[in-house]
Amino acid sequence: MWASTWALNGFLAGGVSQMTSCHRMEHELSAVYDITHGHGLAILIPRWLKYVMNDDNAWQIKRLGTNVFGLDDSLSDREGAEKAIEALSDFFFKTLGLDSRLSDLGIDDKHFRDMAENACKQLGGTLHGFIDLTPDDIVKIYEMCL
């Protein structure tokens, strides 16, 4: 109990950019549609990573590839990040066999705008993370998942 409290209270992550934007986006997804949190994250995370990747954060995404998937560390940050996203997608959709698109689960874009606005509501209209996301950005990421 003590360890889980420390793991989840956010104190240890102070000053470090987090994936909280993606989690907030998925909570909206599973609140509206019949999809589990884990499956929603599996569909969202690769598209979210592609959307938010830039020259300032590509090295962090590349680290996912080298540390989790054993990808070549000598690749450029951008190339390593792209390969990491591909490896993550392959794991979710080929290895685990999960449906890879929201449309595979009968989900359409009907509620995307409301979901995006709800995801940002408590944070002043913007989700913070690798990059700040507005409701317009979130709708685009949801659409990438169709």
What are these regions (language model features)?
Residues 61, 67-146:
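C-terminal charged capping/lid subdomain of soluble metabolic enzymes
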